[in-house]
Amino acid sequence: MKDLQKLSPEIVTINQSFEMEGADMDKMLIFFYEDLRAIGDSWIMDSDWIYRSKYKNSGVGKNKSDRLVEHVLAALDGLIKTTRERFGMMDLESEGRKSFTTPKGVSSEARRSFTRSASYSESNNSFYPSPLTPRSVLPGTMMMSSNSTSPSLWNLRAQALDRLSPVDLKRFAMQILSQRDSESVSETKIGIEEENEESEILAEEKEEEDNDFSVLETEGTEQEIKTEHHRESSGTEHETEAKDHSEGFETEHHRIECFETEHEIDADDHIEDFETEHHHIEGLETEHEIDANDHIEDFETEHHHIEGFETEHENETEDHSETTTSETDSTESSPKEDVPPPPPLTSPQTPSPTVSTFNTKSSLRSQPPPPPPSPEHKAPAPPPPPPMSKASESGEFCQFSKTHSTNGDNAPSMPAPPAPPGSGRSLKKATSKLRRSAQIANLYWALKGKLEGRGVEGKTKKASKGQNSVAEKSPVKVARSGMADALAEMTKRSSYFQQIEEDVQKYAKSIEELKSSIHSFQTKDMKELLEFHSKVESILEKLTDETQVLARFEGFPEKKLEVIRTAGALYKKLDGILVELKNWKIEPPLNDLLDKIERYFNKFKGEIETVERTKDEDAKMFKRYNINIDFEVLVQVKETMVDVSSNCMELALKERREANEEAKNGEESKMKEERAKRLWRAFQFAFKVYTFAGGHDERADCLTRQLAHEIQTDPDQSESSIMS
């Protein structure tokens, strides 16, 4: 327990060690188990890590002491197993790790171990605070300062830090830098007073070295004093930020120093646990993959931004690189007109300003950069950030910026330095100054109208209340009028439109007469309809383009003209079918006659059925324009078709009688089967006509019975021969 207290003084307190002295074995085991579990819960993300032990707790047949021993062994085994899995993954992936160099000019105070972070939030929800170990990939915020960490624990972390995998290393470092506790107000005031004294001394030295900038340095010193009074009057917010900034530099320099401590690690002992931890790392990488991809391009752009800034202020940086404390003061003591002071904090817990130093992309996204310094007041520039490693330029580094902005409670970040020339052209996600303007569109249409022959006209005044508020000369109307002018010009030059104009002038009188005739036309006689239709077509067929010519005559009844044409075409078609059927010649042979009549019947049958379905609607439309079409022609067509089928049956019976006479005279007929098939075919056609017409007349009914009797009484016919 004393060893655990030395390694983890935040978890295993001294009071617990004293309480165990003189206690019985069961109580000591309980204390020991609780401390082991608290240590494991502080850095192991899996809440069931104890149950992964090979020791299975079973109280069957065991006393209390044995069960306590099993609990302790399970906790130890689970802790060792989880640690071995984590370190095994780190050993195998450490071969591809890049070396890091320690920047010059870092004070000795910066060369120390990382500060521990708490496992839970600042709301004291955690029961077991713990030091940060390599197992923590995404630890929570800190609960204690780094002063409580023992030196032995620092050494242990320094050794374990080098075992981190590249994925864990990036997240581990950024979480440490982002989650720092606020220092006390008294310590911050003392640190700022010392920084002010050193800044004054530094200003005096610069004044002696360079007489050209003496006036500017004096003004800078006076401004620093004013800024200090302003910070003290505004509260502890700015003081806490200055202290955190200084400690952020120290922590980052120590992080880089720890990276170059060890480079050779044996990975053979942990090869079996690699696959298990590899899946865990892949899950973590997948969890942050989207955020990393969103920020990686902007971060690389900002990296070049920082490099350009470092080159621009190289001379001034050399004078300010003696100590990290003086660097922080130089950043905070710049004049107001150069770098605006940070806004007041909204909560006592603030993220470290170091984040803005290493990840200026986050600050650019949260607030606009300050204006460049004026020529009259050139303040000392802040020192450039330490060289950024390739690992810190990855997506996980950028992912921290998103976490920082989310969990920081709207805390301000470090103001970004002024951008060097040409550095902002590649910032993809920066706020653009480009805006859409309706004036450009209006100007375009106005110029287009001017080029098409219309002058530029200003906007009309808004109409008063109750009047039309639409502008008389809007861009759309100007464009339409321009198109009309262009069309008119094309019309004048086109021979086609010239011919149309000639037709208008030539047939104007005939069209006017036709116009009045169509308006007054009404009839019930279909012959009169056909005659009037022919007269109209004889005039209109002479026009080059009927639509274009008639459009020149206002009030021409085009709709009634279309109705007259429809009625005339319909009646003409029905009358043509009727005439064709009446003039149909009934001539032998029967097979050829049936072939022709069946083809024609199938052709007009569908047309007649369509007219019957729509005749009621057509009759209403025709009557609206004083045209009463006679649909009795449909009945005439059906009756005529029945007469044609009756004639076919008579021809079939006639051929049957001739065949019987030949048989009586002793002449054997060689076409008995063919005659039988012709009888059956004539009967089938008669039945189709019966279905189409809806009935038979007396003549057709009598012939159908006779034909059926002949088919039934024919001794030479069989069912198979007829059906074949």
UniProtKB/Swiss-Prot annotation:
Record's keyword terms, sorted: Coiled coil
Region called Disordered, residue ranges: 97-131, 187-252, 309-434, 454-473
Composition bias type Polar residues, residue spans: 115-128, 400-410
Compositionally biased spans, kind Pro residues: 367-388
Coiled coil residues, start to end: 187-217, 495-522, 649-678
Keyword Glycosyltransferase annotated: no
Acidic residues: bias regions: 193-212
Cited InterPro entries: CHUP1/IPGA1-like
Domain of life: Eukaryota
Basic and acidic residues bias locations: 223-252, 309-322
Disulfide bonds: none
Compositionally biased intervals (Low complexity): 323-333, 347-366
PANTHER family according to UniProt: HYDROXYPROLINE-RICH GLYCOPROTEIN FAMILY PROTEIN (PTHR31342:SF32), PROTEIN CHUP1, CHLOROPLASTIC (PTHR31342)
Protein name: Uncharacterized protein At4g04980
Classification of source organism: Eukaryota, Viridiplantae, Streptophyta, Embryophyta, Tracheophyta
